[in-house]
C-alpha cells in the first residue's frame, strides 16, 4: 500500500510539473497576444478551465503527502516526506497568494505587466 501511495504521489507531481511547464512556456506567452477586448473573457475561461486540469492532481498530491507522513514507505527517510510536504506547501501558498491575485487583476484590468508577473511568480 505504501509503495502505491508513493507511485500515485510521483505521478501526480509529474503531471503538475508538466502542466506548469506548459503554462509557463506556451500558455502565458500566448496570453500576451490576446487582443485587449478579449483579454477579460480569456482570463476568466483560463481560471475556470485550469481548475479542471489541476484540481485532481493537486488533490492527489495533497492526500498522498498526508498518507506518506502517516506511513513512510520502507527505504524512504521520514524527513524526505516532510521536505516534500514543505515544498508542496510553498507551491500551494505561492499559487494562493501570488498567482490567484494576479489572475484576478488580469480579469479586472488586462495588462501585459500582470502577465509578466504571472510568469515570474508561477
Region annotations inferred by a language model:
Residues 86-122:
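A mid-sequence interfacial segment
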Amino acid at each position: 500500500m505504501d509503495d502505491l501511495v508513493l507511485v500515485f504521489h510521483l505521478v501526480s507531481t509529474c503531471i503538475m510539473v508538466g502542466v506548469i511547464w506548459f503554462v509557463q512556456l506556451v500558455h502565458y506567452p500566448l496570453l500576451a497576444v490576446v487582443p485587449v477586448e478579449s483579454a477579460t473573457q480569456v482570463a476568466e475561461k483560463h481560471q475556470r478551465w485550469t481548475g479542471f486540469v489541476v484540481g485532481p492532481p493537486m488533490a492527489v498530491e495533497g492526500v498522498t503527502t498526508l498518507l506518506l507522513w502517516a506511513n513512510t514507505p520502507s527505504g524512504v527517510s521520514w524527513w524526505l516526506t516532510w521536505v516534500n510536504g514543505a515544498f508542496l506547501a510553498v507551491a500551494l501558498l505561492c499559487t494562493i497568494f501570488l498567482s490567484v491575485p494576479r489572475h484576478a487583476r488580469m480579469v479586472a484590468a488586462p495588462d501585459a505587466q500582470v502577465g509578466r508577473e504571472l510568469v515570474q511568480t508561477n
